[in-house]
Amino acid sequence: MGISRDSIHKRRATGGKQKMWRKKRKYELGRQPANTKLSSNKTVRRIRVRGGNVKWRALRLDTGNFSWGSEAVTRKTRILDVAYNASNNELVRTQTLVKSAIVQVDAAPFKQGYLQHYGVDIGRKKKGEAVTTEEVKKSNHVQRKLEMRQEGRALDSHLEEQFSSGRLLACIASRPGQCGRADGYILEGKELEFYMKKLQKKKGKNAGAA
């Protein structure tokens, strides 16, 4: 028996059973879920779908393109861990990558980009003490440019804490089982606070259970 998306097997509105009055149709088929796992052994399958179109079914992934909205920067980075999923805790336990899953990504590419753009190495010292690196001698023109950029520079304190730990919380915005990629965005502001509270609550519950 294949997976079918028809309504013939459902009961009537009155609650009575309905007889199968025709066979299954190709256009009503369903496929097994991808359940994309977090793994370094990247596996993506090509699937021919209706109309001769193509879907890319990611079975194992560990990298993705993540954008940092407030800085208008996108970097390819490693996904390190699945931290939270609003729909199902089982998906966190099994490290499954789905749309809207909250994951921890490697902060290094963003750190590097920030250093290049502002000349500031974030996440080095304690909160609020960003260090300006003086290792490479810069020309006056470059120094003036960096100073101009620093005037409008603002960094969320929560984000700075995460940069010190080397892991950033991010949300997956693509559908790995449909397009074969796990792309998303770095959490900031109110959204970041919301998910940090959720994770803290979860940690507290686990500690209580233990």
UniProtKB/Swiss-Prot annotation:
Q: Which GO terms describe its molecular function?
A: structural constituent of ribosome
Write out the entry's keywords from A to Z: Ribonucleoprotein, Ribosomal protein
Give the compositionally biased regions (Basic residues).
8-22
Region called Disordered, residue ranges: 1-22
Q: Which residues form a coiled coil?
A: none
Q: Which InterPro entries match?
A: Ribosomal_eS8, Ribosomal_eS8_CS, Ribosomal_protein_eS8_euk, Ribosomal_Se8/biogenesis_NSA2
GO BP:
translation
* Name of the protein in question: Small ribosomal subunit protein eS8y
Q: Which organism is it from?
A: Arabidopsis thaliana (Mouse-ear cress)
> What is the primary gene name for this protein?
RPS8B
